Regions:
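Bacterial N-terminal signal peptides that target proteins for export
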Residues: 1-8
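Bacterial N-terminal signal peptides
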Residues: 8-15
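Sec/Tat signal peptide C-region and signal peptidase I cleavage site
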Residues: 18-22
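Exposed aromatic-hydrophobic patches
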Residues: 43-49, 94-101
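Noncatalytic modules at the cell exterior or secretory-pathway interfaces
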Residues: 52-59, 102-119
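Short, surface-exposed beta-strand/strand-loop-strand elements in extracellular ectodomains
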Residues: 62-85, 124-130
Length: 131
């Protein structure tokens, strides 16, 4: 008798978790680089390894909020794309999806420009995601 409610609860938990896992898989976002921002300056550079081509990019912030002004994307062919953000990104959230100009692009590095971070506070971790 006591096993039936346990089995039903396990089935419900499994069914509820399945759509979330499927959503993550179909979004195709890959974390291609990350960095904990220095906080001592208002500019940081994130190098991206490999030679993959992407259509879109977004930045996700963890551990603490970050007041992002903008970021520059530098491609392997030395072209650049300046992206204005001008928003406070809360911990656990991402910027809007940014279409990369031109055909599918190979990213070399991204330079972040943000408002200074208070000393002694938790420094944000920024993840670069692309697809």
């Amino acid at each position: 008798m006591s096993r039936a409610p346990l089995l039903i609860a396990a089935a419900l938990v499994t069914a509820a978790a399945a759509p979330a896992a499927a959503q993550n898989w179909t979004s195709n976002w890959r974390t291609i680089a990350f960095k904990t921002v220095s906080g001592g300056t208002d500019v940081d550079r994130i190098n991206v390894r490999g030679s993959y081509r992407y259509r879109e990019v977004r930045l996700c912030v963890f551990n603490a909020p970050l007041a992002m002004r903008d970021f520059d994307v530098r491609f392997e062919n030395n072209q650049r794309q300046d992206v204005r953000v001008r928003q406070r990104i809360r911990a656990g959230t991402c910027t809007r999806n940014i279409d990369l100009s031109g055909n599918r692009r190979d990213i070399e590095w991204i330079r972040l420009k943000y408002s200074p971070i208070r000393r002694g506070g938790t420094r944000p971790l920024v993840r670069v995601q692309a697809r």
